[in-house]
């Protein structure tokens, strides 16, 4: 039993990681210190940010090496914070282009006052993270094209209402409906 556990789940001190997974982590750690890889990653992320910025998408600037952050509050300036402009953009990107992103705004960080009114987060951002070794140039170009449609239809987006939320960490499991 112990031998099979080590083969399939890894040694007890590996934290449940198999040898294959630990090798993948080691390769990843080596790759991220390669100057050529780092340059490629940063240039790819900046390319995405620059191209959508040129189209008029408000982003946090300058762009870093991991992700592009879209300012959903500025993009959807007609949507009040209590209708969650960041989450609305997350949903639009997924529905229009199948692009998975994450809201970093009032869904994630908003709270309620004693009267049950939303205390909005200071920013309504959407993170377009670029995972390592996953996307090619054509994938990045596709995301840029999807923003053409997002911009074309932005006034039609009215926001969302939370219809079900847990007490804690609501950004993981809340349910929404379109307004």
What are these regions (language model features)?
Residues 1-86, 91:
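Active-site C-terminal subdomain of aminotransferase-like
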Residues 32, 96, 108-179:
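PLP-dependent enzyme catalytic core of the Aspartate aminotransferase-like
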Residues 47, 51-55, 88-99, 144-154:
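Generic non-transmembrane alpha-helical segments
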Residues 63-67, 88-90, 96-99, 122-127:
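Active-site lining segments that contact anionic ligands and/or coordinate catalytic metals
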